[in-house]
């Protein structure tokens, strides 16, 4: 089973960083409803668009997704 996006994102956490992906990871950690078992782009994108006011731009998710895909390769 591939690593979930959430598991990958947690490797990007850094409470001391203002880097966008790190900030996204820090906030996703605090989001109790985040789809932690998801590995597919569309359901994650839909969730974030509808439920993640902490994500100022979907471009940040796109960047994190590309990092996730690279980590799986």
Swiss-Prot record:
InterPro entries the record matches: UPF0346, YozE_SAM-like, YozE_SAM-like_sf
- Gene3D superfamilies listed in its UniProt record: YozE SAM-like
Q: Which family does it belong to?
A: Belongs to the UPF0346 family.
The molecule here is called UPF0346 protein LVIS_0790
The source organism is Levilactobacillus brevis (strain ATCC 367 / BCRC 12310 / CIP 105137 / JCM 1170 / LMG 11437 / NCIMB 947 / NCTC 947) (Lactobacillus brevis)
